[in-house]
Curated annotation (Swiss-Prot):
Cellular localisation: Cytoplasm
Coiled-coil ranges (or none): none
Family: Belongs to the class I-like SAM-binding methyltransferase superfamily. TPMT family.
Stored InterPro entries: SAM-dependent_MTases_sf, Thiopur_S-MeTfrase_Se/Te_detox, Thiopurine_S-MeTrfase, TPMT
Name this polypeptide is given: Thiopurine S-methyltransferase
Assigned keywords, A-Z: Cytoplasm, Methyltransferase, S-adenosyl-L-methionine, Transferase
Domain of life: Bacteria
Source organism of this protein record: Shewanella amazonensis (strain ATCC BAA-1098 / SB2B)
Binding site residues for S-adenosyl-L-methionine: 10, 45, 66, 123
Lineage: Bacteria, Pseudomonadati, Pseudomonadota, Gammaproteobacteria, Alteromonadales
GO biological process: methylation; response to metal ion
Cellular component GO terms, alphabetical: cytoplasm
Length: 218
């Protein structure tokens, strides 16, 4: 899955992975991280997610990583903000209203960019990757996140053969085995969300579970 795949998705606005509302699990479980103060929060593969506005409204400085320049511009446009932009290495930093979106390749991010973050949030990053690439993402995330840092992970799970991702199915067992190699994993909640996802209903996917996990970097 090359960068061009995601650029094409944004250019054609085939962004079914984008949610038009703040994720309910984020609202319900963010406090589970028990963050002290209102520190920085890292959001990998953030797109133009409204979840970042929620995090900023909690007083956090949000640091998002996003490949698509179009996604970045659409986020700030929707927020009615005109970001200040600067180039740092091969990435471009866009900042406004407590949110900084780092435009460029997630896999080439420097650890220093997220070293000061007190928490992280992954709603659409892990599930964006097919199984053969997902482990590389987890390893990079683990390399960026300092030991002891908590995060909220939200996944989807369904019979993968029933639908061509993204989003891809990520089972609880996969999270325990591969994410658990680098993070302490606590299941916060899992529920059937098939009725709320017309694309999956239309494709006759028999079931769809959304799960929230509390992660802590080992």
């Amino acid at each position: 899955m090359e960068p061009g795949f995601w650029h094409d998705k944004w250019q054609s606005q085939q962004i079914g992975f984008h949610q038009s509302d703040i994720n309910p699990f984020l609202v319900k479980h963010w406090e589970s991280l028990k963050l002290e103060g209102k520190g920085k929060v890292f959001v990998p593969l953030c797109g133009k997610s409204l979840d970042m506005e929620f995090l900023a409204a909690q007083g956090h400085e949000v640091i998002g990583s996003e490949l698509s320049a179009l996604a970045v511009s659409q986020f700030f446009e929707a927020a009615g903000a005109k970001p200040q932009s600067r180039t740092q290495g091969e990435h471009v930093h866009h900042s406004a209203q407590g949110v900084t979106l780092i435009e460029g390749d997630f896999f080439t991010l420097d650890e220093e960019l997220v070293a000061g973050c007190s928490g992280f949030y992954d709603r659409a990053a892990l599930i964006a990757w097919p199984a053969e690439m997902r482990i590389d993402y987890v390893r990079k995330l683990a390399a960026l996140i300092p030991a002891g840092t908590p995060g909220l992970l939200i996944t989807l799970d369904y019979p993968q053969e029933a639908l061509i991702g993204p989003p891809f199915a990520v089972s609880p067992n996969w999270v325990e085995e591969f994410v658990g190699e680098y993070f302490e994993v606590v299941v916060l909640e899992s529920q059937d969300v098939l009725a709320d996802n017309p694309r999956f209903v239309k494709k006759a996917v028999p079931w769809l579970n959304e799960a929230a996990y509390l992660l802590v970097r080992k």
